[in-house]
C-alpha cells in the first residue's frame, strides 16, 4: 500500500488534513462517497502558501459592493471575486493566517479609534457603541467551525461571470439597460395621455397626475423587497417574479373601473417593477471586475433617465390617434412582457448564489456536508437584513450631511426630468397649441443630449483609469462628470425660460432638452460613483438612501409643476428652477476640493476606502 493510500485509509472519517509544508493545495477526504466502489476520493483545497500567492493576507479587505447584504462579520470577503486553483478554501487555513472573527474585530477597533480623532464627540460616542457591537458580534463564540471549507470559483471558471466572453457580457449589459428603460418608461407612459385619464374618470389634472407620481413612490419602497430576495435567491429569481407581477398588474391598470383602482395598481406596479432600478446596476457589476466596470455602469446611469422620456414620446401619438387610456397600458404591458421573457433568459450573474449552487453540487458529489459559502456558514441574519435594507439607509439620511447633499442633487436632477414632462405640455401645448403627439416629439432633444453624455462618460472613465495608474484614487476623483454636466443642467433651464415666447420658433425651448439631457446623465453617473466610493463599506445602504430620496422628489415635482408655471408664468417658473440648479453647480466643485475634509468633519465615521487597511 502506498503512503498516500495509508493516509486515506487512516483518515477516512476526517474531513480535512493539514498540509504542514504548505507548498501545494492540501487534500481532504470526504466522510462519505457516492461512488459504486465506495472508494474515497482525494480533493484538493488551498493552503496558506497558495492563498498568499494569490494575495490573501491576514487583513480582510472591504467586501465587493455586490457581496451579500445579509452576511455579517466576513472573514473571507474575497470568496465571491477570487479564483483559486482548487476552488475550496478551508476555514482552518484562514484561521491559521489570522482570519478569525476576534482578530478582525481587534483590527476594526483600531480603525474606529483612528477615525474617531477626526470626529465630533457625538461621533465618538457612536463609534464606541459600534465598537462594542463589533466585539459582541465577533466574539469567540461566533468563530466558524475550522472543518468548514468555503467554495470559490476555480481559475478560469466558466461559471464566473467575469470569464464570460466580452461580447456576451456587453450583450447582457445592453439588454439589462433596456430593462431599466422599460421600467422607467412605464412610470411616465401615462404622462403622454393625461387627458384620457381626465376624460375617462371625470377628474381634474391634479388627480390624473397621481397616476404617474404613485408609481414613482413605489420605486422607493420596492427595493425593501427585492434587495433581500436578490441576496437570498439571486438576480434571476428577483427579475422573474417582480417583472411577472408587473406585467400582470398592468391588466387592472388598463381595465380599472375607477380612479382609485388605477392609482392603487399603479403604485403596486412601481413596487413590483423597481427590481429593474435597484438590481440591474448590481447585475452589470457582477459581470465586470471593479477596474473595468465603470464603462458598463455608464449604460445603467443612462437608462433610468432616458426611459421616462420615451413615455410621452410614444404615448402622445396613442392619445391623439385613439383617445384610449387602456391602449397606453396594453402597450406598456407588451413592452414589459417582452423584457420579462428576455430578463428571465439571462443566466444568473450573482456570484454568491452561483457559489451556493456549486457548493450544493460538491456536497452531493463528495458527501462532505461542510462545503459551503460563508453566507451559508454564518446563516442569514434577519437583523442585518433589516439594518442594511431599512435602518441603515434611514440612519444615513439623518446623520450623513455629505450623502444627503449628494442625494439632494441627484434628487433635484431626477425631479427636474419629471418636471419637464409637465412643463412641456404647458409650454408647447398651451403656448404653441400643439397636441400631445407633437409635444412628445419635443422630448427627442433630451434623448440626444443623454446619448451625447453617454459617450462623454467613456472619456471620464478613461481619465479616472489614468489616475488609478498614477496614484491611489480618492472618491473625489469621481466628480469629473458632475463638474462637466452641472453647468449644462442649469443652462438648460435658463434657455427654457428665456425662449418660452410664442414668437420664438419651437426650436428655442426644445433645444433646452439637449443641454439638460447631457447634464443630467453626467451628473447622475458621476455622483452615483462618488456615493459608492465614499460609502464603500455600506455602499448598498447608501445607494438605497439615494433611491428613496430620488424617487420621493420625482413623485413630488409633477404635483406642483403645472400650478407653478401657471402662477409664476412660463419664464419665472423655469428661472426659479434655474436659480436652484445654478446654486448646485458649486457642489461637485466644492466636494472636489474640500470633500475629504468635509467627510472627515461632518460624517459620523469614515466609510470610504481610505479608512480600510488593504
Swiss-Prot record:
Coiled coil: none
Record's protein name: Polyamine transporter 2
UniProt similarity note: Belongs to the major facilitator superfamily. DHA1 family. Polyamines/proton antiporter (TC 2.A.1.2.16) subfamily.
Keywords: Antiport, Cell membrane, Membrane, Phosphoprotein, Transmembrane, Transmembrane helix, Transport
Residues bearing PTM Phosphoserine: 50
Function, as annotated: Cell membrane polyamine/proton antiporter, involved in the detoxification of excess polyamines in the cytoplasm. Recognizes spermine, but not spermidine.
CDD domains registered for this protein in UniProt: MFS_Tpo1_MDR_like
Compartments reported by the entry: Cell membrane
GO molecular function: antiporter activity; spermine transmembrane transporter activity
Region (Disordered): 1-40, 99-144
Single biological process term from Gene Ontology: spermine transport
Cellular component, GO annotation: cell periphery; fungal-type vacuole membrane; plasma membrane
Topological domains annotated Extracellular: 195-206, 258-266, 319-326, 429-437, 500-503, 563-574
InterPro entries: MFS, MFS_dom, MFS_trans_sf
Amino acid at each position: 500500500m502506498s503512503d498516500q493510500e495509508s493516509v486515506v485509509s487512516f483518515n477516512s472519517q476526517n474531513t480535512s488534513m493539514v498540509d504542514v509544508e504548505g507548498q501545494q493545495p492540501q487534500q481532504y477526504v470526504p466522510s462519505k462517497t457516492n461512488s459504486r466502489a465506495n472508494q474515497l476520493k482525494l480533493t484538493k483545497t488551498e493552503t496558506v502558501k497558495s492563498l498568499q500567492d494569490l494575495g490573501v493576507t491576514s487583513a480582510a479587505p472591504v467586501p465587493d459592493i455586490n457581496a451579500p447584504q445579509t452576511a455579517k462579520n466576513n472573514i473571507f470577503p474575497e470568496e465571491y471575486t477570487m479564483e483559486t486553483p482548487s476552488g475550496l478554501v478551508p476555514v482552518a487555513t484562514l484561521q491559521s493566517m489570522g482570519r478569525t472573527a476576534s482578530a478582525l474585530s481587534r483590527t476594526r477597533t483600531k480603525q474606529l479609534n483612528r477615525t474617531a480623532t477626526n470626529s465630533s464627540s457625538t461621533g465618538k460616542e457612536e463609534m464606541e457603541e459600534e465598537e462594542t457591537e463589533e466585539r459582541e458580534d465577533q466574539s469567540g463564540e461566533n468563530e466558524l467551525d475550522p472543518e468548514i471549507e468555503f467554495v470559490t470559483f476555480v481559475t478560469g471558471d466558466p461559471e464566473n461571470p467575469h470569464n464570460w466572453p466580452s461580447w456576451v457580457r456587453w450583450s447582457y449589459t445592453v439588454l439589462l439597460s433596456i430593462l431599466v428603460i422599460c421600467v422607467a418608461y412605464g412610470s411616465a407612459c401615462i404622462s403622454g395621455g393625461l387627458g384620457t385619464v381626465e376624460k375617462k374618470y371625470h377628474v381634474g389634472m391634479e388627480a390624473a397626475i397621481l397616476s404617474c407620481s404613485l408609481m414613482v413612490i413605489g420605486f422607493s419602497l420596492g427595493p425593501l423587497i427585492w434587495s433581500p430576495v436578490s441576496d437570498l435567491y439571486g438576480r434571476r429569481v428577483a427579475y422573474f417574479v417582480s417583472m411577472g407581477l408587473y406585467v400582470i398588474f398592468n391588466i387592472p391598470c388598463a381595465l380599472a373601473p375607477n380612479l382609485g383602482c388605477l392609482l392603487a395598481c399603479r403604485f403596486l406596479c412601481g413596487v413590483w417593477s423597481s427590481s429593474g432600478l435597484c438590481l440591474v446596476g448590481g447585475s452589470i457589476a457582477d459581470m465586470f471586475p471593479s477596474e473595468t466596470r465603470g464603462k458598463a455602469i455608464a449604460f445603467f446611469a443612462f437608462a433610468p433617465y432616458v426611459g421616462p422620456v420615451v413615455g410621452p414620446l410614444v404615448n402622445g401619438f396613442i392619445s391623439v390617434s385613439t383617445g384610449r387610456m387602456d391602449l397606453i397600458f396594453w402597450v406598456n404591458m407588451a413592452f414589459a412582457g417582452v423584457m420579462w421573457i428576455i430578463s428571465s433568459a439571462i443566466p444568473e450573474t450573482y456570484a454568491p448564489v452561483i457559489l451556493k449552487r456549486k457548493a450544493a453540487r460538491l456536497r452531493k458529489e463528495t458527501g462532505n456536508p461542510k462545503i459551503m459559502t460563508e453566507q451559508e456558514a454564518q446563516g442569514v441574519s434577519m437583523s442585518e437584513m433589516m439594518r442594511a435594507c431599512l435602518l441603515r439607509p434611514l440612519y444615513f439620511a439623518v446623520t450623513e450631511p455629505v450623502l444627503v447633499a449628494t442625494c439632494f442633487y441627484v434628487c433635484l436632477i431626477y425631479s427636474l426630468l419629471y418636471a419637464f414632462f409637465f412643463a412641456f405640455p404647458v409650454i408647447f401645448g398651451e403656448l404653441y397649441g400643439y397636441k400631445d403627439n407633437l409635444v412628445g416629439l419635443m422630448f427627442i432633444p433630451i434623448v440626444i443630449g443623454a446619448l451625447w453624455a453617454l459617450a462623454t462618460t467613456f472619456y471620464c472613465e478613461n481619465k479616472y483609469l489614468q489616475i488609478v495608474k498614477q496614484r491611489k484614487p480618492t472618491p473625489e476623483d469621481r466628480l469629473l462628470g458632475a463638474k462637466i454636466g452641472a453647468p449644462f443642467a442649469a443652462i438648460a433651464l435658463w434657455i427654457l425660460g428665456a425662449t418660452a415666447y410664442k414668437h420664438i420658433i419651437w426650436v428655442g425651448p426644445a433645444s433646452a432638452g439637449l443641454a439638460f439631457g447631457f447634464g443630467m446623465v453626467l451628473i447622475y453617473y458621476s455622483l452615483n460613483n462618488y456615493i459608492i466610493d465614499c460609502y464603500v463599506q455600506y455602499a448598498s445602504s447608501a445607494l438605497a438612501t439615494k433611491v428613496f430620496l430620488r424617487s420621493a422628489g420625482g413623485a413630488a415635482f409633477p404635483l406642483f409643476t403645472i400650478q407653478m408655471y401657471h402662477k409664476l408664468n412660463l419664464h419665472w417658473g423655469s428661472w426659479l428652477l434655474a436659480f436652484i440648479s445654478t446654486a448646485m453647480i458649486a457642489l461637485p466643485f466644492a466636494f472636489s476640493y474640500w470633500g475629504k475634509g468635509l467627510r472627515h468633519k461632518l460624517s459620523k465615521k469614515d466609510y470610504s476606502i481610505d479608512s480600510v487597511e488593504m
